[in-house]
Amino acid sequence: MCPGLWGTCFWLWGSLLWLSIGRSGNVPPTTQPKCTDFQSANLLRGTNLKVQFLLFTPSDPGCGQLVEEDSDIRNSEFNASLGTKLIIHGFRALGTKPSWINKFIRALLRAADANVIAVDWVYGSTGMYFSAVENVVKLSLEISRFLSKLLELGVSESSIHIIGVSLGAHVGGMVGHFYKGQLGRITGLDPAGPEYTRASLEERLDSGDALFVEAIHTDTDNLGIRIPVGHVDYFVNGGQDQPGCPAFIHAGYSYLICDHMRAVHLYISALENTCPLMAFPCASYKAFLAGDCLDCFNPFLLSCPRIGLVERGGVKIEPLPKEVRVYLQTTSSAPYCVHHSLVEFNLKEKRKKDTSIEVTFLGNNVTSSVKITIPKDHLEGRGIIAHQNPHCQINQVKLKFHISSRVWRKDRTPIVGTFCTAPLPVNDSKKTVCIPEPVRLQVSMAVLRDLKMACV
């Protein structure tokens, strides 16, 4: 206080202010970009659309640089000569930042030399799902306007890769539609099903929205779309009921969201790990598990598609086929990848009833099992076994003959047959390994045999 001396007090404060301004001119400007985080909304104020575009770079993967105006982009670390990857999240019921986004951004920056931009539309995706759907067109227009600024800086349409999660996949599809399908790539991570399964091609993600469109389906019986929407559609574990996810509703929120979000975690794992998440074209998951689809010749000419950043998913054929359903199995936790093998058992004599044989691969303290059925009056039964160990680390196979507990008069006659296996894709007979001698199986008694398979 300056009691009774207001003029003196004013002069002192003015001098201090002048000194602070003058001294600040001697401090070199900071080179650190200002970091901006995702917005937080709530049910009362989260339905009105408010978009942020946040740029992340390898030099500071935890710092999102707000790039909305042309000047923001020019003054940022954005590199127009690199590819650009946009991440678009989906519906945010509680108005919170996606829990997976930081890990996703870091994985992308490590895996690709590219600009990574997260589209934050927490405001607009919160509250009721249907209000978020109503914001999709407006959001798509805002993203399209933002991309036009990047194109003015020299970015090519073909270098833009949109990765959309759930509802964000259809946002990406609409943006691609606005650019007449000339964007480089769109990846849909379990594209949303409600309101979109019967939507027109203009309203949802489809193969015409980019030069290459892929979708990973993990929750087709609940929150995800059940129809193919890309050039290649991965139906992981059949597209529903992912291993490790709760099977009963008493698990609460995890029961509702686990299958749906598995697509995100699979993609992150594909970015972080080298083991391939390879899939195989087939008419259905049931047919795939039955061993009816063993290679990728039709329609990919032997190049099996893989989840991840590999160009066009590893598909080399031209022109690209559309809406191809491909199937793969996974484990319950990261890195999720498995090796798929065909297993076959050929009976020496036909039987008048179905024959069930349990096949177990043993190697390095890891076991994998599958049951195959030989229909009555048939000699051959086959199936697909998924195993974590590479083929050359499978040391033994255990075979066990089962009979149905529902049959009153049980035929316990032993069976005799030959066992063979081959890693997928089965492109030639040279990969097939058979147990040299016929195997005699008695009911419920396990038989162990050595296996020697080459690494592939």
Swiss-Prot record:
EC number of the protein: 3.1.1.111
Catalytic activity reported: a 1,2-diacyl-sn-glycero-3-phospho-L-serine + H2O = a 2-acyl-sn-glycero-3-phospho-L-serine + a fatty acid + H(+); 1,2-di-(9Z)-octadecenoyl-sn-glycero-3-phospho-L-serine + H2O = 2-(9Z-octadecenoyl)-sn-glycero-3-phospho-L-serine + (9Z)-octadecenoate + H(+); 1-hexadecanoyl-2-(5Z,8Z,11Z,14Z-eicosatetraenoyl)-sn-glycero-3-phospho-L-serine + H2O = 2-(5Z,8Z,11Z,14Z)-eicosatetraenoyl-sn-glycero-3-phospho-L-serine + hexadecanoate + H(+); a 1-acyl-sn-glycero-3-phospho-L-serine + H2O = sn-glycero-3-phospho-L-serine + a fatty acid + H(+)
A Gene Ontology biological process term: lipid catabolic process
Alphabetical keyword list: Disulfide bond, Glycoprotein, Hydrolase, Lipid degradation, Lipid metabolism, Secreted, Signal
UniProt-listed Pfam families: Lipase
Annotated signal sequence range: 1-24
Cellular compartment(s): Secreted
Family membership: Belongs to the AB hydrolase superfamily. Lipase family.
Protein purpose: Hydrolyzes the ester bond of the acyl group attached at the sn-1 position of phosphatidylserines (phospholipase A1 activity) and 1-acyl-2-lysophosphatidylserines (lysophospholipase activity) in the pathway of phosphatidylserines acyl chain remodeling. Cleaves phosphatidylserines exposed on the outer leaflet of the plasma membrane of apoptotic cells producing 2-acyl-1-lysophosphatidylserines, which in turn enhance mast cell activation and histamine production.
Identification of the protein by name: Phospholipase A1 member A
Native source organism of the sequence: Rattus norvegicus
